């Protein structure tokens, strides 16, 4: 009896969805490969066109080498990324399991209203819409009735919120979804640093390797947070994102 309780508690803590059989339409889909596919840099949502304020730090000589790039990444991941991206992913994932579309739309509204920089708001909407449309264009993939209802009713989707709905709709584990999303988005940031600072490719890989321990800490922290922490963002990053709007020359849209 005690053993059964322990298993139940563990499943809840890591966000393992209810054991539901695959539909015939998705019987051929391997979620292990699918989660790699949607997090791949070539998945066509346009994330490579955005730096989310990083370009301002680089032009203002705040990020100039491997050490300052790593410092920036740690600060960004533990503030803006954790309380907006990671937490909203978790909240929309859990709401999808509960079939609570109203709560998902509420989370997206909070993010939209809490994101002061215009470029970041537009970037969130573009990436979210593009993620949804790309999934819908994959005709072999049956996302289910709830995802389709979400896709029709969402007004301000973000990449993270739509990804959370996607992961839960296909019965992916929450912790696995968080892990893949965190790594993929951090890798994009590192690529931006390598191209724009610039850094060597080796320095970029050293940065990613050194972030493995912080990655695990961020995932565990995300699982502990609730909706009251949503968008507890970094004011400094918002300022840099606003300043990006008036940079003389720009490589990125945000």
Curated annotation (Swiss-Prot):
Q: Provide GO CC annotations from the record.
A: cytoplasm
Biased composition annotated in UniProt, kind: Basic and acidic residues = 1-11
Question: Does the keyword field hold Glycosyltransferase?
Answer: no
Its transmembrane ranges are none
Q: Which residues form a coiled coil?
A: none
Query: What are the recorded GO MF terms, alphabetically?
Result: nickel cation binding
| Primary location recorded for the protein, binned into one broad class | cytoplasm
State whether keyword Chaperone applies. yes
Keywords noted in UniProt: Chaperone, Cytoplasm, Nickel insertion
**Where does the protein end up?**
Cytoplasm
The record's section on Pfam families has: UreF
Q: Which InterPro entries match?
A: UreF (IPR002639), UreF_sf (IPR038277)
Q: Where is this region: Disordered?
A: 1-25
Q: Which family does it belong to?
A: Belongs to the UreF family.
Q: How does it assemble?
A: UreH, UreF and UreG form a complex that acts as a GTP-hydrolysis-dependent molecular chaperone, activating the urease apoprotein by helping to assemble the nickel containing metallocenter of UreC. The UreE protein probably delivers the nickel.
Q: What does this protein do?
A: Required for maturation of urease via the functional incorporation of the urease nickel metallocenter.
What name appears for this protein in its UniProt entry? Urease accessory protein UreF
Organism from which the protein derives: Helicobacter pylori (strain P12)
Gene encoding this chain?
ureF
């Amino acid at each position: 009896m005690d053993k059964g309780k322990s298993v139940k508690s563990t499943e809840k803590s890591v966000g393992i969805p209810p054991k539901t059989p695959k539909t015939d339409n998705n019987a051929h889909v391997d979620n292990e490969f699918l989660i790699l596919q949607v997090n791949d840099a070539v998945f066509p949502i346009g994330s490579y066109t955005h730096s989310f304020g990083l370009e301002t730090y680089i032009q203002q000589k705040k990020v100039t080498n491997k050490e300052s790039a790593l410092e920036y990444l740690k600060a960004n991941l533990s503030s803006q990324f954790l309380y907006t991206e990671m937490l909203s992913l978790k909240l929309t994932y859990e709401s999808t399991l509960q079939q609570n579309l109203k709560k998902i739309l509420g989370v997206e509204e909070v993010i939209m209203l809490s994101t002061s920089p215009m470029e970041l708001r537009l970037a969130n909407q573009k990436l979210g819409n593009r993620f949804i449309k790309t999934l819908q264009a994959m005709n072999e993939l049956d996302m289910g009735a709830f995802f389709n209802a979400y896709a029709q009713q969402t007004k301000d989707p973000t990449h993270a919120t739509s990804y959370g709905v996607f992961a839960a709709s296909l019965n992916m584990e929450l912790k696995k979804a968080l892990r893949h999303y965190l790594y993929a988005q951090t890798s994009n940031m590192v690529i931006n640093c390598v191209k724009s600072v610039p850094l060597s490719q080796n320095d970029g890989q050293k940065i990613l390797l050194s972030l493995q321990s912080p990655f695990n800490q961020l995932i565990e922290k995300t699982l502990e947070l609730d909706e009251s922490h949503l968008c507890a963002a970094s004011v400094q990053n918002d300022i840099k994102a606003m300043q990006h709007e008036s940079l003389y020359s720009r490589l990125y849209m945000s």
